[in-house]
A protein has these predicted regions:
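Transmembrane beta-barrel strands of outer-membrane/channel proteins
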Residues: 46-54, 94-102, 155-161, 190, ...
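Predominantly the C-terminal beta-signal and adjacent terminal strand-loop region
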Residues: 222-292
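Short loop/turn motifs that connect adjacent beta-strands in outer-membrane beta-barrel proteins
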Residues: 35-44, 83-94, 142-153, 194-200, ...
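Short glycine/proline- and aromatic-enriched beta-strand/turn motifs that initiate or cap beta-hairpins
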Residues: 34-108, 278, 283-285, 289-292
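Residues on the lipid-exposed face of transmembrane beta-strands in outer-membrane beta-barrel proteins
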Residues: 76-84, 134-142, 157-159, 186-192, ...
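Extracellular loop and loop/strand-boundary signature of outer-membrane beta-barrel proteins
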Residues: 58-70, 117-127, 169-177, 213-226, ...
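Outer-membrane pore/translocation modules
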Residues: 99-187
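Residues that define the transmembrane beta-barrel architecture of outer-membrane proteins
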Residues: 42-44, 70-76, 126-134, 151, ...
Length: 292
């Protein structure tokens, strides 16, 4: 572990005599602080990933009125993380990632007349879906040992931004909608050194949705949606092919809801509302990273 990197774990800085003795004693066992280099390498890294995101969106409207989007799209992400000492505090953890998923999904819905009656209950078309997710995390790692296994837990606070473009405008009865929201929350990440080169990570977080909205192309107003809790969980593996070259695989599951909007004017003499909806996204990614 290079001292100039200033990354620390349990024995990372000058401490009182009792603390030094504890660190020296820990170093005599297989689960020593130094042995946690694998997690430090995994957490001090920049990476690029590619994979698949499965979208499942549906609206709760009423009997005979279904409105949903479902399908798989190509996903790409870029991210970076670091675990180090900062301002005299050891094992601070920071990460940031941007992910974009784009592709065609299947719309299942209905057509209605001017008075709102259903004129075609099962209408199918193709939607171009583009989702953008930005996630930032800040926390502190607490190293521990599970028998002879090296591990650590990282409680953190988080911010995320979600943007979904729902574009079926190529269809004669299609539309163009853009959904957006922010999430402020926190979570807990657990990491385990499976081998000196392989690190497994489990992560779960939840947060409060803020500023959710939907913009409809051609409308003179934006629909203000109801804010609901957001839950995200995931699992990942990071393998050090070489000291600085890593490969990774991740899975993430997320669920959120939008509450019904107020009746909103979309054109002179015409108003509408956005119904309650639910979204479940599942994302599988593989990629490469550079550990520093």
């Amino acid at each position: 572990m290079s001292p100039k990197l200033r990354r620390t774990i349990a024995c990372g800085q000058r401490v009182a005599a009792a603390g030094v003795f504890a660190c020296l004693a820990a170093g005599t066992f297989p689960g020593s602080a130094f042995a946690q280099e694998a997690m430090l390498r995994a957490n001090n890294q920049v990476w690029v990933d590619a994979g698949v995101q499965q979208l499942h969106y549906w609206e709760d409207i009423g009997p005979g009125k279904s409105d949903s989007e479902r399908g798989n799209t190509a996903a790409f992400s870029l991210g970076a993380s670091t675990q180090r000492q900062l301002f005299g505090v050891s094992n601070l953890y920071f990460s940031g990632a941007v992910r974009v998923a784009h592709g065609n999904v299947d719309y299942g819905g209905y057509l209605q007349g001017i008075t709102g009656q259903v004129v075609q209950p099962n209408y199918q078309m193709t939607t171009r879906s583009t989702t953008t997710d930005v996630t930032l995390k800040a926390g502190k790692a607490f190293p521990l040992h599970l028998g002879t296994w090296n591990a650590q837990v990282i409680p953190y606070v988080s911010y995320s931004y979600h943007d979904w473009i729902r574009d079926s405008s190529r269809d004669p009865y299609g539309f163009y909608e853009r959904y957006r929201h922010h999430v402020i929350g926190g979570g807990l990440m657990g990491q385990l050194e499976v081998t000196p080169k392989l690190v497994a990570t489990a992560d779960v977080r939840a947060g409060a949705m803020v500023g959710s909205s939907m913009t409809l192309a051609g409308s003179q107003n934006t629909f203000t949606l109801g804010n609901k809790p957001v839950i995200v969980a995931g699992f990942g593996l990071d393998y050090a092919v070489a000291r600085n070259f890593h490969v990774n695989a991740t899975y993430e599951w997320s669920r959120f809801q939008y509450g019904r909007s107020d009746v909103t004017q979309v054109a002179p003499g015409s108003s509408a509302y956005e119904p309650d909806s639910k979204t479940i996204n599942q994302t599988w990614m593989i990629g490469v990273g550079y550990a520093f």
